[in-house]
Amino acid sequence: GEAINKHFISESAKPQFCIVGSGPNGAFPHHHTGDRKVKQGDAVLIDIGGRKGTFPSDMTRMSVLGEPPEGYLEIHDIVERAVQAALSAARPGVMAKDVDAAARNVITEAGYGEFFVHRTGHGLGIDIHEPPYITATSEVVLDEGMVFSIEPGIYLQGRFGVRLEE
């Protein structure tokens, strides 16, 4: 997290958060700091955000130290497809719940629906989490100019988690 914070500062931005979950800790969507060291074969989930001026950023990416754990590449591919499905569905006039369904359907059809345990996305504006919320029940109609994240994930307890955030 220290290197990420230094990068934000070098870009005249203020670091806000840095979540790093390696191996089984990546299976907790908002993992808190612990003593576990990153090990060979770990999938590493990195969720970072900062603020430049008034506006926040929020991004999640994945990395692997060495060879990926069993099943990781399949899960990563499913989550990538879920992101793309949601991005394709997101356009003016569409309800937020339909964008959520686009991502959720990809994951459910692949057999991992029970492991997608959070909303698909949230608005980014003055606050890091604000409307529109991209959830299964949100009837908010998306409009041009709305800024929101798309961040589906699959979390396999005791193994690893994969989340990609656009």
What are these regions (language model features)?
Residues 1-166:
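Active-site neighborhoods and metal-handling regions in enzymes and metal-associated proteins
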